[in-house]
Amino acid sequence: GRHMTWMTRWQSLTTALVLLCTSLVGCDSDIDSDTLVRELRILSLRIGSTEPFSVADAQAEVKPGPGGLDLVFTSDHLDLNAFVAAPTGPGRRIAAPRPLVYEWFLCVGPASLFNQGTLDPGCRKWLPGDPDPMKSSSLRYLGSGQTFAMPTAALKDVVGGVLQLLLTGGPGGGGTVKLPEAPVSLLLPLILRVRVDGGDPNDIRDREVGVTYLRTWVALPGMTLPAPNVNPSLGDLLAGPDKDGNKTALIPCTAMSCPKNKVKRGADLFLIGGSLPGSAQTYVRADDTEQKMRTETLRYSWFATDGDFDRERTGDTQPDNFWNSETKRPAPAEATSATLWLVGQEERGGADARSYELELTN
């Protein structure tokens, strides 16, 4: 899999509190649910454009070139997209929206390059007292933007170097050549740091770091690249006040507008989330020598600024959920709206996400 992870001091603190409470008799833990979002938070990182079913992998071929073999990518760039929550408004800790800075990095530490799915220790240093990541030898700065068109040329020397070591056992190429029988699959860690422009560098609420893994396929001469993984595409989010009654589709936010969907404050809102047909692909795992076909499993993660969900995650076999704005962490009395986020993901790392503005009515 290629699931996104987060690196924050807050998560470390939460884990410590959980361990402490389990060791004490009668400890009453009041830790917030993972679904509650009241501060800056990365909810999803998507490799691929925001178009439905966009390609989520990088692919390259080794071809004869003027100076020998050359590594040629099938596309000149890959879009990287960040789905970030930063709640503001009446009753919130931050009243007005603040500009955010998005910084993308490639982890090039040896543990990440030669131990697939591992994050090198040098790529884990993001706390206020840690060295500037822009100067880290384990990190390569790629560019900025909530949507960033990453040139695949930025991957060429990294992928080429790893490929040479895997095939020959050394940078000089003097080792025994071990030609694979199928295209080579590499997992490259991509890291996003998002921070408030002009925010407090010592306040962890003003920044967040997320990690995802870019699967890169490389075909040697005579090999055929596999069909690329594509991102799933969320369908309508159906909602209604009755569990078994009629439900209508909530209108999602777009880059141009964020319509308000009226819901009753303090009432259960029953929800059904899912994806469009074709979102769950069939595939062969990269490490499967038996070439067994399997179908992706889609899971849905739910988030909101207030209240609580019945379930933090759902799937296509049990797509139902419900939310109430006033349970556990009620919306502030001054707040006239809440935000709901839905993130869909499959085990190979493809993702899609939507946000919905809810107008709280009495």
Region locations from a protein language model:
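Bacterial N-terminal signal peptides that target proteins for export
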Residues: 3-17
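Conserved structural position at the C-terminal beta-strand
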Residues: 194-196, 342-346
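Exposed beta-strand face motif in extracellular beta-rich ectodomains
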Residues: 182-192, 334-340
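Solvent-exposed loop segments of extracellular immunoglobulin-like
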Residues: 95-103, 296-301
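Contiguous beta-strand segments within globular domains
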Residues: 58-91, 250-287
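Low-complexity "stalk/linker" and mucin-like segments enriched in Ser/Thr/Pro/Ala/Gly
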Residues: 52-64, 109-162, 293-322
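Short beta-strand elements
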Residues: 186-193, 198-255, 351-362
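Bacterial Sec-dependent N-terminal signal peptides
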Residues: 22-55, 353-355
